């Protein structure tokens, strides 16, 4: 899911 991605890329572009 997307949570697995956001763990290494918080909210930085």
Swiss-Prot record:
Major site of localization recorded for this protein: secreted
GO biological process: defense response
Annotated keywords: Amidation, Amphibian defense peptide, Secreted
GO CC terms in record: extracellular region
Residues found modified as Proline amide: 13
Protein name, UniProt field: Electrin-2.2
The species this protein was found in: Litoria rubella (Desert tree frog)
Protein localization: Secreted
Domain of life, source organism: Eukaryota
Tissues with expression: Expressed by the skin glands.
